[in-house]
Amino acid sequence: MNKETGLTNLYILAFTHRNLPVSEIGDLHIEHDLQEDRLTKFKSTMNFGELMFLSTCNRVEFTFTTTDKVDTKFLQKFFHSLYPNLLETERHSFATNASIFSGLTAV
């Protein structure tokens, strides 16, 4: 079996001080007591096989598996589904500034 076969559908979206001001990264934080409900619904909406959310003082990361193509349309749905209260310009900023890793580079 090819090593990458099992990783083909693995993605990481990362937001750090390298690609966004820390104040904007904070807009992606989800309070601990809301995470289970919001992320469970989000995982179902996006049809993810797996989903992990990491939020620290200067970083937010989403690790997930999907068979969907991760492109601009996907990212628009991603941010609209999880952060419906963000302005369109904010969602666009997050979508265009995300560091996206996939397959072996996500490991």
Model-derived segments and their meaning:
Residues 1-107:
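N-terminal ligand-binding/catalytic initiation module
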